[in-house]
Curated annotation (Swiss-Prot):
Pathway: Glycan biosynthesis; glycogen biosynthesis. GO terms for molecular function: alpha-1,4-glucan glucosyltransferase (ADP-glucose donor) activity; alpha-1,4-glucan glucosyltransferase (UDP-glucose donor) activity. Its EC number is 2.4.1.21. This is Probable glycogen synthase. InterPro entries: Glyco_trans_1 (IPR001296), GS/SS (IPR011835), Starch_synth_cat_dom (IPR013534). One of its GO terms (biological process) is glycogen biosynthetic process.
């Protein structure tokens, strides 16, 4: 099968959020047995940092003006997938999400693909590709699919063939098959009026995103942190860190937590991080507040964008009360909405010693937060799929999350009543139903009760199932240690691109699009 993928952003060249990671990984794993090429734009001239061949020029007309693009051929630096990159200096420097870019991108795509033979399917991703998908189907008569990574972002209104609709609606209307990124999210949105209207009984399903387990292998954490700092910062120079497996995570993770966060190794690292050239996909990091404690003081981490979707209003309401009731610490690594950033800075400064706010975008630091945290929180109001929970679990860190979308599909929840239904040997996190203060506080307290605070009570039924009674949170047989192991193996077996059924399902989606396009009456 010859597959063309339209990619708004791609990790590590230009990446914002999880979409860039999927655009790196999906082509990599689809290319086994298929011919795959990715079409993208030269955002901020970043592709000039790669070896490339300038193969031709394409001129398109936008609002009466002729704009000429160089067409660059290169390969992805880590996956080897073929990339076709459209480059014009003026357009390159527009914001990554500027709709003008994607109006022009649509014409670039159809002009380029018009000379490419034997294309089986064109796969577009999110609103940015909606117009391109419409034109590939309508003008080039090619089978097309559209993957909705976050339906909350629909793009600007645009006119096409006398109809006015958003970029996303246009893509849904013209695509031969449509999917979103988890089965539960597909169920949540399938009856939204605009989706129902434009789907018009076409195939619609949810296919889970995955992660490349080789990228998030805790045995490679030092190598990963070095690579992600352009080999300018070696984490071993700042604090204790060691590769670890699922089997020894209960020994290594608490030492990373204590050394980097409670003893302060992270502060010197951030100071040096802010001095190096990081490229367009990373930023300097501001430090506000701080955390201290002993090795058994629970540390709860957050990694993600500072947006309303991620549940910040709930966290701002609940965390002060949680700090009053419990001896716990929080570390945040986030960047985004300025108002959220300011509220978080103020919260951290008010609770210095108990909250550390790292304001910025840094992939090495995200690995560190995953590895050093006892739990990761994701109180999202909605979550189409989510990659953070998979990345956290790959680092053997259980997740406290809202029971929604992809979080529901990827986290195996600790039973609400472990006395009667102890499932510590299977659970990878805690799910709560309502993402408000009460729900979130229940989730955090349920997690901490059964992994830190109630070890004596746990012994009553842990002995029943023939485990030695744990005395400390990180004993080999403790609930937390068991859940750490569960997390890694769950990701490896069920959520990695290598082993999950998602690649097979994408091939099925493409086959359905081809059938719909050519064979449906």
């Amino acid at each position: 099968m010859k597959i063309v993928i339209l990619a708004p952003t791609i990790t590590p060249i230009v990446s914002y959020g999880g979409l860039g990671d999927v655009m790196r990984d999906l082509p990599k794993f689809l290319k086994k047995g298929n011919e795959v090429v990715v079409l993208t734009l030269n955002h901020y001239n970043r592709y000039f940092t790669l070896p490339y061949e300038d193969i031709k020029k394409i001129t398109v007309i936008y609002k009466g003006a002729k704009i000429t693009f160089d067409v660059l051929r290169t390969k992805h630096p880590t996956t080897g997938v073929d990339l076709i990159v459209f480059s014009n200096e003026s357009v390159n420097n527009l914001n990554v999400w500027d709709p003008i870019k994607y109006e022009i991108f649509a014409d670039l795509v159809i002009t380029y693909l018009d000379e490419v033979k034997d294309i089986d399917v064109v796969s577009g991703h999110d609103w940015m590709c909606g117009l391109a998908i419409a034109k590939c189907n309508d003008i080039l008569d090619l089978p097309t699919t559209l993957t909705i990574h976050n339906e909350a972002f629909k793009g600007e209104m645009i006119e096409y063939k006398g109809e006015v609709m958003t970029f996303l609606e246009l893509g849904i209307k013209y695509a031969d098959a449509v999917n979103t990124v988890s089965p539960s999210h597909a169920e949540e949105i399938k009856n939204y009026p605009y989706i129902k209207k434009y789907l018009n009984n076409k195939p619609f399903c949810g296919i889970l995103n995955g992660i490349d387990i080789d990228e998030y292998d805790p045995m490679k954490i030092i190598e990963r942190m070095c690579n992600l700092s352009n080999n300018k910062l070696d984490p071993r120079n700042y604090a204790y860190i060691s590769p670890y497996s699922a089997e020894d995570s209960h020994n290594i993770k608490p030492k990373i937590k204590y050394s980097w966060f409670y003893r302060g190794g992270v502060y010197e690292y951030v100071e040096d991080w802010n001095k190096i050239d990081k490229g367009i996909s990373a930023t300097d990091v501001e430090v506000h507040g701080g955390v201290d404690g002993d090795i058994e003081t629970p540390l709860i981490g957050f990694v993600g964008r500072a947006t309303h979707q991620k549940g910040f209003n709930t966290m701002f309401e609940a965390i002060p009360e949680l700090l009053e009731k419990h001896d716990i610490r929080f570390v945040f690594l986030t960047k985004g909405d300025r108002d959220i950033e300011e509220r978080l800075k103020n919260l951290a400064n008010e609770h210095d010693g108990r909250i550390l706010a790292l304001i910025g975008y840094s992939l090495p630091l995200s690995s560190l937060v995953f590895a050093g945290s006892d739990w990761i929180i994701m109180p999202s109001y909605w979550e189409p799929c989510g990659l953070v929970q998979m990345e956290a679990m790959a680092y053997c860190t259980p997740v406290i999350a809202t029971e929604t979308g992809g979080l529901k599909d990827t986290i195996i929840p600790l039973h609400p009543n472990p006395y009667e239904h102890p499932n510590f040997d299977k659970a990878t996190g805690v799910l709560f139903k309502v993402p408000d203060k009460v729900g979130f506080m229940w989730g955090v307290e349920h997690a901490l009760n059964w992994t830190f605070y109630k070890l004596n009570e746990i012994c009553m039924f842990m002995q029943y199932i023939r485990y030695k009674c744990p005395k400390h949170p990180y004993d080999e047989n403790s609930p937390l240690s068991m859940m750490m192991k569960n997390c890694y193996y769950h990701v490896f077996r069920n959520l990695s691109w290598q082993n999950s059924p998602s690649i097979r399902k994408y091939k099925g989606l493409f086959g359905g699009a081809i059938y719909n396009h050519y064979l449906q009456p």
